[in-house]
Amino acid sequence: MIDNKHQIPREHGQAGEKLAMNYLAERGLNFVEANVRYKFGEIDLIMKDGKEWIFIEVKYRSKAQYGGALNALSPAQIGRLRRAAEHYIQIHKIDAVCRFDLIAIDASQIHWLPNAF
């Protein structure tokens, strides 16, 4: 028996990440990597704006219920993303300005918050 209960949210997340990547690329950012996973956290997108590295969390909600995508990021998730980014910076020996952005997608609305946290 195949368990599909997590398949639909994962597909929505991947679709949201693709939308976010295209949205940011249209605004001049350069794609580096997606879905970087470590045991202690995950980075949805890594992009660059000139020499600046951008670690991006993507939140997708098909409906704006419960505060929508803009309010879907918890302090614990921020901590995990920061740890993952610090690890990525260390193993890739990055010595550059970095920032953390949030892309929040509610149905068809895309909100980009540079330096979100």
From Swiss-Prot:
Alphabetized SUPFAM superfamilies for the sequence: Restriction endonuclease-like (SSF52980)
Domain of life: Bacteria
Pfam families the UniProt entry points to: UPF0102
A molecular-function term among this protein's GO annotations: nucleic acid binding
Record-linked PANTHER family: UPF0102 PROTEIN YRAN
Family: Belongs to the UPF0102 family.
Protein name as it appears in the record: UPF0102 protein Swoo_0351
